[in-house]
Design a protein with these regions (language model features):
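A short acidic (Asp/Glu
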Residues: 47-52, 73-77
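Active-site-proximal loop/turn and secondary-structure-junction residues that shape catalytic pockets
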Residues: 8, 43-45, 68-70
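Short, surface-exposed basic-aromatic patches at helix termini and helix-loop junctions that form
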Residues: 51-60
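Short, conserved catalytic/metal-binding motifs centered on acidic residues
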Residues: 38-46, 62, 130, 155-164, ...
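A short, flexible helix-boundary coil/loop motif
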Residues: 192-260
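Electropositive, glycine- and tryptophan-enriched low-complexity nucleic-acid-binding patches
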Residues: 1-33
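Short amphipathic alpha-helical "interface-anchor" segments enriched in bulky aromatics
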Residues: 144-181, 185, 189-196
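An anionic, glycine-rich sequence signature occurring as long contiguous blocks
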Residues: 61-164, 248-259
Length: 260
């Protein structure tokens, strides 16, 4: 996790993104000066300011979803017709891809590479588009969309995991500042659990478990705590079913320098 910031419902989804990106890119560059950074996001972040910022920085590229419109759909008309024919003959989802240059009427400062996916399903046409700074010589249209952009779904799953398992979507106070503080707490908890996955749960049955599952099996457990002069004793119930896992994870954490 690099950033967690709330925005008002009356603001553009991409409001403040460049401001947040600049210090993140600077920190990454300090640690890995030669590493290439690629920004991947849905169409809510397809804004000229974000794309221009990436284009002005070396080894900083983007692959962003692009909302469809009549001009874009017209550009892939032949591919949509071909996909429809394939669907009618196979009765399966069919898709064709087209690579072209495109510029909006007013909001973009220059032409950019756009990949159109002309997909035809049982319910009808389903055109999709992305815009990118990555050259076609590096990734053709199909691989860029299917292998790279669609992998964004895993990122969305991580966001949902934090929302559902760690209450990142809770905004029940009247103040934006207090709701932002709640999001920070949720984000800190996610980072701690992710660190536990990496250092303590690797190779165990919970290595790929989601936050709520880890919390239920390792955190939300009944125990008796007794404090003496030199020690804190934690006594688990004999019926606790994950005691062996808890002990194994705790032992791993103890082996980390400065750990438990």
């Amino acid at each position: 996790m690099l950033c967690a910031r709330r925005r008002g419902a009356d603001k553009d989804p991409a409001s403040g993104v460049v401001t947040e990106l600049k210090p993140i890119v600077e920190k990454l560059r300090q640690a890995w000066p030669e590493v290439r950074i690629i920004l991947r996001a849905d169409s809510g972040f397809c804004r000229d300011a974000i794309m221009s910022y990436c284009e002005q920085n070396t080894k900083l590229d983007y692959v962003l979803g692009l909302a469809k419109n009549s001009r874009l759909i017209k550009r892939i008309g032949a591919e949509l017709a071909q996909a429809q024919k394939l669907h009618q003959s196979s009765h399966k989802a069919a898709r064709e891809f087209k690579d072209f240059r495109y510029r909006t009427g007013h909001s973009w400062s220059c032409k950019r590479r756009v990949v159109g996916k002309a997909q035809y399903l049982a319910k009808g046409a389903n055109p999709r588009f992305i815009v990118t700074s990555i050259a076609s010589e590096e990734h053709d249209a199909r691989s860029l969309y299917e292998d790279f952009y669609c992998a964004r779904g895993d990122m969305e799953n991580r966001i949902k995991e934090q929302q559902l398992g760690l209450f990142a979507d809770r905004t029940s106070t009247a103040s934006m500042r207090s709701n932002q503080l709640r999001l920070y707490f949720s984000s800190f908890a996610y980072i701690l659990i992710q660190t536990l996955r990496r250092l303590g749960l690797q190779g165990s049955e919970l290595a790929q478990a989601q936050c709520d599952t880890i919390g239920l099996k390792l955190f939300k457990i009944g125990a008796q705590i007794r404090v003496t002069v030199r020690k804190v004793w934690v006594s688990f119930s004999e019926s606790y079913p994950y005691l062996h896992l808890f002990q194994r994870v705790f032992a791993r954490l103890e082996q980390i320098p400065g750990g438990a």
